[in-house]
Amino acid sequence: MTIPLYTFVRGDSLGLILLVDEAHSIAEVATRAQRAAAMRVAPAARVGVYRAKVRLDPKLTVASAGLAPLDRIDILPEPLNGV
């Protein structure tokens, strides 16, 4: 099932509605969001996906993370050294 998500990539001047499949991993969602915003924001080497200020495990699927249509997610760059 396709789910539309309000997606905000740090540094982008626009919010995006990203269509994702419930079987996509959170890591795939992050990649797709960065590609969609790439004309305005250079993709970061490492990012976290957050919903309501809670970081989502990149291995979870959209469905297992409990994301619902029109939920907001934020894509935020993270340090490469993991700190």
Regions found by a protein language model. Give the residues of each.
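Ubiquitin system architectures
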Residues: 1-83
